[in-house]
Amino acid sequence: MSKKKQKNRSLPGTGSIITSAVFLALVFGFSLAGIASPDRKFSEMENRSLQQAPKVSFEGIKNGSFTEEIESYMSDQIFLKDELVTMKTGADTVLGKRFMNGVYLADDDFYIQDFQENSQQIKTNIDCLNEFAKGLDNNIEVDMLLAPNASCVLYDKLPAPNQCGDQHKTAEDIRAMLDPKIHLAYPEEALRTEAEECYYHTDHHWTSQGAELGYSALRQIMELPAIQKYERSVRELDNFYGTLYSKAPRTGAQSDTIDLVTYEGNAITVRYPVAAGDHEIPAECTEVNGIPQKEGLFVKAPESTKDKYAALMGGNFALTEIETNADSNEHVLILKDSYANAVLPELCAQFSHISLIDLRYYHMQEESVSEYVKSHGINRVIYIYNIDFLNTDNNFVWLE
C-alpha cells in the first residue's frame, strides 16, 4: 500500500501539467508571433530607432559586433514589448515599488527623474563655461539661466524614503564656481510658487509656465524691460506622454498638455545651417541660398506623434539661427540644452538676432564657437542649462 502511494506521489498532477502546457503555449505562441509579425523600425514609446536584423559577415562574427547586434535585435523586436513593459510596471506598482529605471512614481501622478550629483563632471563643465567666458572680449555680456529640475522644485512629492540628491545644494555649488563675469539667474524660488504648473507630469522638461518664470529671472539680471510690444497667445497640444513615462509606462497615467506660446505680430525666421542633431531638418523648410529655413518656431510633424515636445523647433540641432522683428538689435548667442527651447518665444520677443548652439552636436563644424562669436558679431552670450544636464553631459569640452 505504501509503495503505491509513493508511486502516485512521483507522478505529475493535472494542475502541474496544465500550468506547464500554458507556459509552453505562451512561449511558443510569442515566438511564432514574433517571427510572423514584421519588424518594427521605430518605437514611439522609447522615441528611438530599433535594431534591424543584422547581416552576417565574417568580420562581424570575428569582432563580436554581430553578436551584439543580434542581442539588440532580439531585445528590440520582442512581440508586444511595449504592452509587456506596461504590465510589468503595473505589477511593480501593486507591489509597492515607487522607483523604476531611474524614475520616481511621485505623488499627484508626477514622474520625477532621480538626481545623483557627479561633482567632478559638474566641475569640468563649469570650468569649460568659465574659460570660454573669460576668453571673450570684455564688451560681450555673459549671462546664465540655470534651471532646477523637478526633483528640486517638487521634492516634497517624492516617495519617502528616497535616495534622491539635493539639487539646491548643487545649485549653490555651481553659483560658487562660476566666474564673476557670468551673471547667474537661478529661478528656484519663483518656480516653487507655481510648482505643479512648472513641470510636466510625464516628462523631464519644464512647461511653458516654468520657462516663462525662468526667463523673467534671466531678464531681470540682464536689466531688460518686460515684453510689451506683442500679445501672448497659446495653442495647446494634448495627450503628451514624455520620456519619463516611457521608462515606466503604466495604465491610467495622467497625460500632459504642451502650450505652444506665440507673441502675436513677431515675425520669426529660423535657419538650420548645420543638419546635425537629434531630428531631421523640419519638412516645412525651403532652401534659401543653400540653407534650410522656415517661418515660426513650431514644427507640425511631431504634433501627431508621441514626441510632441519636438514641436518646439523640431528638436535640437548643432546650430540654428533666428531673425525676428523685436526691437533689440543685439546679436545673441545661446549655448543650450533642450530646456532652452521652451524659453525661445520670450527670447524671440526680446532679441532680433539669435544663434543657438547645442554642444552635443556642434563639434567644431566649420569654425569653433569662439570663431563663430567673432565672425557673426555676437555681443551677448547666454548659457541656458538645467542642472541635471550639467551633471551628466560630457560635450562641454567642445566649447572653444
Q: Which residue ranges define each predicted feature?
A:
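Extracellular glycan-modifying ectodomains
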Residues: 1-400
